[in-house]
Amino acid sequence: MRIAILSRGPALYSTRRLKEAAELRGHEVHIIDTLHCYMDITSSKPAVRYDGEELPYFDAVIPRIGASITFYGTSVVRQFEMMGTFVVNESVAISRSRDKLRSLQLLSRKGIGLPRTGFANKPDNIKDLIRNVGGAPVVIKLLEGTQGIGVVLAETPKTAEAMIEAFMGLKANILVQEFIKEAGGADIRCLVVGGRVIAAMKRQGAEGEFRSNLHRGGSAELVRLTKEERATAVNAAKIMGLNVCGVDVLRATRGPVVMEVNSSPGLEGIEYATGKDVAGMIVEFIEKNARPHRTKTRGKG
């Protein structure tokens, strides 16, 4: 097969591993810079152009779309969909998962376990907003943040009020969530491919750090999932309509709660922690499912 990887970083671990895994299985792989693609969207014959030429037909496209280029990146993915190319994660599913508020609303509607979450623009009663999610300590998140950036822990009511007021002053959209203390600064990243969890790791935040992101100095190790955790991850991926994703889960007293569904999960940490060929499993999924015009909208909302 001829496979395209949409990525701005050909040297990034995940991009390199996907390319290596596909080539090892005899496929032709092209790494394409998403922002350098351009399109004639009114043409009766949809195409994507790159470096002055029309791109050849690809049997499959693997989108590795960074959060900062979601709008343009999903437009490029959508153009490939119009051409009948099989895409690993479709454009609407990527957009759905990138909107933290929208994704939480959709997961909540389907009964997925979530931390109590508040959303407001300019509340006339900040104290009530904080009380409504269980009171301090609370976690305050920027809707546009990634890799733990824009996530702060407010340990007292006064600190929480001050932080919320500060974000409001910047006209920033924020989520206010209950702090799951019993998780102990750890979360579980479940890698879902084709409707099943193929790998899972426990990420532990650095000492004194409540965020478990590996980019923030956290560590990772192999973890055994419970049946409930596995089912939660699979259902969350299905609701988002994603074929390949990372589902981040916290172990709360009441059961697993989903923090985020990542449509472009990094492979380095989970491959090292589990020793599994995750990239190879993604390529295997493509081999089994890539057919022309097979992409269809999954998930709702």
From Swiss-Prot:
Class in the EC hierarchy, top level: ligase
Cofactor mode of binding and number, as noted: Binds 2 magnesium or manganese ions per subunit.
Sites where the protein binds Mn(2+) 1: D248, E260
Keyword Ligase listed: yes
GO CC, alphabetical: cytoplasm
PROSITE patterns assigned: ATP_GRASP (PS50975)
Residues the entry annotates as binding Mg(2+) 1: D248, E260
Pfam families in the record: RimK, Rimk_N
Enzyme Commission number(s) from the entry: 6.3.2.-
GO molecular-function term, one example from the UniProt record: metal ion binding
Binding annotation for Mn(2+) 2: E260, N262
Domain ATP-grasp, chain residue ranges per copy: 104-287
Entry binding sites for Mg(2+) 2: E260, N262
Cofactor or coenzyme needed: Mg(2+); Mn(2+)
Keywords for the protein's UniProt record, in alphabetical order: ATP-binding, Ligase, Magnesium, Manganese, Metal-binding, Nucleotide-binding, Protein biosynthesis
Gene Ontology BP annotations: protein modification process; SOS response; translation
Similarity section: Belongs to the RimK family.
Protein name per its UniProtKB record: Probable alpha-L-glutamate ligase
Biological source species: Teredinibacter turnerae (strain ATCC 39867 / T7901)
Organism taxonomic ancestry: Bacteria, Pseudomonadati, Pseudomonadota, Gammaproteobacteria, Cellvibrionales
